C-alpha cells in the first residue's frame, strides 16, 4: 500500500494534461467561413409580351367548279394540281345540241322580226289591229331573249375557272355526263397566296390581357401590334410576317375560345390549307418587367416557385414568388422580387434560410452572368 499516493498523482497528471490539450484544440479551431454564392441583381426592363396560339391554315378563296349546262365532257384542259388563271378553260362539254338551239333561235328571230316590221307598216294603213301588231312585236322580243339564252348556254359548254389558284383533282373524266345543279363539283380551286391562319385564344387569356392593358400593367405594342409570326409544325419560323385581320364577335360555346384570323403572304406556297401551326401575336409591352433566371427559381413541396436572395446584411432570405410564364431562359415574375434584389443563382446547395431574422450569412463573389 505504499504505492497508492504515487498512482493517484500519476492519474491526476494525465487528466490535467488531457484537459489542457482539449482546451488548446478548441482555441485553435478556426471559425466556419460564410459560403460564397453567385447572384444576379434584378433590374426592371421593357419586354414585349407575346402569345403563342394554335391554329390552322385555310385558303384565301375557294371555288367549286360546277357545270351550268347538261352534257357529255369531251375534254379536260388542265393538269391536276397545277395553277390556273381566272377565265381559263377547264373543260369542254359537247356543244352540238346548243349550237343547233342557237341556230334555231337565230332563224326564229329573223322570222319574228320580219313579221313585226310588216305589221308595223300594216298598222299605219290600218290593215291590222293594234292587238295583232302588239302580238307580233312581243314574239320578236321573245325570240331575241331566246337567242340570248341560246348564246349563254353555248358559252357555258366551255367550263371556265371562276378564280385564279391551284386546282385539285378532277372528279369527272372525258365521257362523263354532267348536269346543271348536280351536287358533286367537277373540281375545286383554292387561292393560296395570300393565305389565312385561324387561331383560337381562350376567353380567360383575352380577359386578362384586357385587364392588364386597362390597369396600365401592359401598354399597347405600338404600330406593329397587329403583326403576327408563324411557327411551322417542324418548329421553324415562317419567313413571311402576317397581319391580324379580325377576331370573332362571339365565343365558341363548346371550347370557350375566340377565333382570330391572320393573313399571310404565301408566294412560294409553303403553307397549304389544313396545316397545323402556331401564331405568335404581340399582346403588349411591360415597361418594368421583372425577369429572373430559371436557375435561380426553385419549387417548394407544394410546387410553388421560390427563390433565395441576399439581403443588405448579406443574409439569405427565402421569397415566395408568383411567376406567370417562361420567356426564353427567364421567368416573368409578377410578385416576390423587386428591383435591386440580389437573386442567388449559383451555390444554392451551400446556403439555406433559417428562422426569420437569423438567415445564414454568405459572401457574394463576382456577380453571376445570365445564361
From Swiss-Prot:
One of its GO terms (cellular component) is plasma membrane. A lipid is attached at residue 23 (N-palmitoyl cysteine). Residues 115-155 form a coiled coil. It is a lipid-anchor. Residues 1-22 form the signal peptide. One of its GO terms (molecular function) is transmembrane transporter activity. Belongs to the membrane fusion protein (MFP) (TC 8.A.1) family. The periplasmic linker protein component of an antibiotic efflux pump. Confers resistance to numerous structurally unrelated antibiotics such as carbenicillin, chloramphenicol, erythromycin, novobiocin, streptomycin and tetracycline. Is not involved in organic solvent efflux. This is Antibiotic efflux pump periplasmic linker protein ArpA. The gene is arpA.
